[in-house]
From Swiss-Prot:
Belongs to the EF-Ts family. Gene3D superfamilies: 1.10.286.20, DNA helicase RuvA subunit, C-terminal domain, Elongation factor Ts, dimerisation domain. This is Elongation factor Ts. Residues 83-86 are annotated as: Involved in Mg(2+) ion dislocation from EF-Tu. The keyword Cytoplasm applies. PANTHER family: ELONGATION FACTOR TS, ELONGATION FACTOR TS, MITOCHONDRIAL. One of its GO terms (cellular component) is cytoplasm. One of its GO terms (molecular function) is translation elongation factor activity. It is found in: Cytoplasm. InterPro entries: EF-Ts_dimer_sf, Transl_elong_EFTs/EF1B, Transl_elong_EFTs/EF1B_dimer, Transl_elong_Ts_CS, UBA-like_sf. Keywords: Cytoplasm, Elongation factor, Protein biosynthesis. The gene is tsf.
Length: 201
């Protein structure tokens, strides 16, 4: 890569991913200047770093709030990190806000697939089977599994496509920020309010 092109690509990749300059340079070297491949490489590195940091305690963080336009939907979400210093950074606060907006827009019921009670999965599986009565039995198991996977993705915050970039999940977004910041980050809990929900006539 010519030096001017390299600087331009590093800047573009950094703007797209938020990764450190040295990481962007390394990604472009590995991918021989292909920015899409460099972005994939950074994502994989982020996941690897996130796994290494996932056991670290996260006693600090913020509670972010978001009120949707029209004041009909409100969200509170607790996002934790390791240090108060990181909790006060714009990057971390922006992540917490993005997660709150995701919750408002996509209405997740659970944090992750591990949080879905067995009875909820069993009930959903039964509903799917009932809706597929009369289908070819050979295909039934596959279709049921596919529909159940879609239910899990739709219902779980961390599995949902990120509303601002559908090519990644919320889990991927958090992994990217872990790699960028260098600390473990955990979405601890959230609550979503919608005006008039669960009000009986």
């Amino acid at each position: 890569m010519a030096n001017s092109l390299s600087v331009h690509l590093v800047k573009e990749l950094r703007e797209k991913t938020g990764a450190a300059i040295m990481d962007c340079k390394k990604a472009l070297e590995v991918s021989k200047g292909d920015i899409d491949e460099a972005e994939k490489w950074l994502r994989q590195q982020g996941i690897a770093k996130a796994k290494k940091k996932s056991e670290r305690l996260t006693p600090e963080g913020v509670i972010a709030s978001y009120i949707h336009a029209g004041d009909k939907i409100g969200v509170l979400v607790e996002v934790n990190c390791e240090t108060d210093f990181v909790a006060r950074t714009p990057t971390f606060k922006e992540l917490a806000k993005e997660v709150a907006i995701q919750i408002a827009a996509a209405s997740p019921r659970f944090l992750s697939k591990e949080d879905i009670p067995k009875e909820v999965l069993d009930e959903e599986r039964q509903k799917i089977i009932e809706s597929l009565k009369g289908q070819n039995k050979e295909d039934l198991d596959k279709v049921v599994q596919e529909k159940l996977e879609k239910f899990i993705v739709d219902s779980c915050l961390l599995e949902q496509p990120f509303v601002k970039d559908q090519s990644i999940t919320v889990r991927d977004l958090i992994c990217q920020r872990i790699a960028q910041i260098g600390e473990n980050i955990v979405v601890r809990r959230f609550v979503r309010f919608q005006l008039g929900e669960e009000i009986e006539n």
